Amino acid sequence: MSEQQNQQTAALGTAPVGPLLFRLALPTITAQVVNLLYSIVDRIYIGRIPLEGKLALTGMGVTFPVITLISAFAALIGMGGAPRASIALGAKENDRAERILGTCTAALWALALVLTALFLLFQAPLLKLFGASADTLPYAMQYLNLYVLGTVFVMTSLGLNGFITAQGRSSVAMKTVVIGAVLNTALDPLFIFVLKMGVRGAAVATIISQAVSAAWVLRFLTGKQTVLRLKRAYFRIDRPLLASAVGLGASPFVMQSTESLLTIAFNVSLQRYGGDAAVGAMTILTSVAQMVQLPLTGLAQGAQPILSYACGAKRPDRMKRVVQLNLAAAFVFAFSIWAAVQLFPHTVVHLFTSDEELVERTVWALRVYFALGFTNAFQTGFQQSFVALGEARISLFLALERKVFLLIPFILILPHFFADKLFAVFLAEPVADLLAAATTTTLFLLRFRQITRDM
């Protein structure tokens, strides 16, 4: 390892927390914002396909559970392995960190092949289960048929990018996402409109973009500039290391995989009470929610290597400072977006559709659904901090609590207590937000105080 690389890694434990958090979080936030373009740009263009944009947009929304599940499996291994590698670096165990990287890479690729085969075989019944109607199923299948062929590229770019951030190279990690998202933005109109491929064109553009992102990640992790190098000798599944990574990655996996269950619950209930138009509105609401969630995740990812390194080095004062700054920045951002959405909902919705009937229904739903959206700052900030500290069990519980224990039951139960069934379905979101934020904040403050006191 070069002297410069040693200095870059050591900075995680010595540089002033404020400037370091800004330096690491800005690229990861930028990466998440740009990553948002992958899905949002597709939706914006698809929603404007002549004559069929409304149904095509709704059909694409039905594919979200599959797309989310692929990302969740990447997180299971990648977001579990990267903090483990960062903790190993903090403890000066560089060889162990590289073995973690090799194990996670082998596992990601094996899992990608399995998922590709399963989704190709069972996509039609799955999409019907997820809320597709006879009108929207053809559009959903057109997109998903091609998208799943790029599963290995998604697993590589999403699953391994955290290992770049884990060594303090968040600017390189940012480029992984920027390269793919910019390319996707450029290719979408070409394939959708110029080549007249419609929904299929959006899928092709996404696959090409993800392949380029994956190539960028592999080029860096096998090159000379990396502290954690992907070595052929370590390219095998070490079961104890994989179990350790999966144990920690279970929380982000549950966070994302339960998003699939959540989408199914929403889609099925909305299809029952409002038809395709209500499902189409939910597609837009999901996009707006991602505008808040993904940057918050990027901020937490920027803070993770600093917090993990400080934990490994047993620096409680530094750990407290990281958590304080992370939470303050998260709240300011989340509150700002919440205010903008509540004040200018028509402007936000018009980004995705020009269909006035869909616009009006979505604006009404958005104000209800996003009523307490700013509480995501507490949920994401504290839950991801538990991941950085290696607290797998608590993080997993918090990941399950909001969606599985609160939100999904509320989606199914609340309509029985309201005359306006659609209102009740959308109301489930802010009710769950309030309860989850209170629980997450309380648990983190209690456990974090204990961890730092015992050091």
Residue ranges of model-derived segments:
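Small-residue-rich hydrophobic transmembrane alpha-helices
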Residues: 57-117, 154-173, 279-339, 343-345, ...
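Residue-level signal for short hydrophobic patches within transmembrane helices
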Residues: 18-37, 41, 66-73, 110, ...
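Short runs within selected transmembrane alpha-helices of multi-pass transporters and secretion channels
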Residues: 147-165, 176-181, 202-215, 297-300, ...
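Small-residue hotspots at the loop-to-helix junctions and early N-terminal turns
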Residues: 54-65, 140-144, 203, 276-291, ...
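Short alpha-helical transmembrane segments in multi-pass integral membrane proteins
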Residues: 1-28, 85-152, 194-250, 307-372, ...
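Helix-terminus/linker motif at the lipid-water interface of multi-pass membrane proteins
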Residues: 33, 37-58, 127-134, 190-197, ...
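Transmembrane helical elements of multi-pass membrane transporters/channels
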Residues: 23-42, 146, 180, 209-213, ...
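Alpha-helical transmembrane segments and their lipid-water interface positions
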Residues: 31, 35, 39-46, 71-78, ...
